[in-house]
Amino acid sequence: MARYVGRFAPSPSGPLHFGSLIAALGSYFQAKANNGIWLVRIEDLDPPREMPGASQLILEALKAYQLHWDGEVVYQSERHGLYQAQIDAWLDNGDAYYCQCTRKQIKEHGGFYPGTCRDKNLKEGAIRLKMTKPVARFLDQKHGMIEIPEQLVNEDFIIKRRDGLFAYNLAVVLDDIDQGVTEVVRGADLIEPTGRQISLYQILGQPEVSYLHLPLAMDDNGNKLSKQNHATAIDIENPKPALLHAMTFLGFDVPEEIKAASMNEILSWGCENWRLEQLPSEIEITPRFSNGTV
């Protein structure tokens, strides 16, 4: 049986906040409870959205919380050659094509791309992958079978944007394959692209990974804690309170004697007592798909 390989893959749009700590802890506990390895990958694909120095702040925060990763940190900004080579191969054999449709035009079709440019033989624009392996549902390790809207299932999706930036779905799958990831543990806000990512595994002829989506931390206004919503950075000078708060959020009932222990002892206890059944069953946010419908 292959060894468990998990990962935490934040984007450097700001320092770690409580919501991203949940994702880091959940992926860490799941990996270590399965006697696996835990990788860290910085998903710096979108420079306009990134904050200078955020990558280092994220790594420093993980160290402060005693979340020590295995191996070297991988940066997506250093892996463009991998992504472009795959795109070129698809373009050469006709599995991908250029598209010049605008967001307005797609919105006029209900928010889903109907394949307008598939047979136009254009030479520039965004690049879309022909959907030859549609995935209508997938099994989440906590939430069971997740159904995906039919229009989204069959959509030829973008793998490289018209501005030259590589699409998240392509990069994350190529990296997970390259790094040998066996299970993806992340926030429930990323349920939406999972079907497309499974399609990519199938198109690439690669064994699929399993998925576990963690409940999301919300603010008082019902918005997901995120850098875009100006979520407060976690305290790295006195990390224990936030660590214990995050563990409670993940369903742990931490004994008083463990609360008084060192950070390493708390994390070791967490690895020994991690159970998927203890996770809150609520996703905390309704998964929303491309056209704004559930």
Swiss-Prot record:
Keyword Iron: no
Enzyme class, UniProt record, top EC level: ligase
Binding, Zn(2+): 99, 101, 113, 117
Motif 'KMSKS' region: positions: 224-228
Cofactor binding note of this UniProt entry: Binds 1 zinc ion per subunit.
GO cellular component terms, A-Z: cytosol
Binding-site list for L-glutamate: 7-11, 43, 168, 186
Alphabetical GO biological process terms: glutamyl-tRNA aminoacylation; tRNA modification
Cofactor(s) required for function per UniProt: Zn(2+)
EC number: 6.1.1.-
The family this protein is said to belong to: Belongs to the class-I aminoacyl-tRNA synthetase family. GluQ subfamily.
Function noted in UniProt: Catalyzes the tRNA-independent activation of glutamate in presence of ATP and the subsequent transfer of glutamate onto a tRNA(Asp). Glutamate is transferred on the 2-amino-5-(4,5-dihydroxy-2-cyclopenten-1-yl) moiety of the queuosine in the wobble position of the QUC anticodon.
Protein name, entry field: Glutamyl-Q tRNA(Asp) synthetase
Gene source species: Vibrio parahaemolyticus serotype O3:K6 (strain RIMD 2210633)
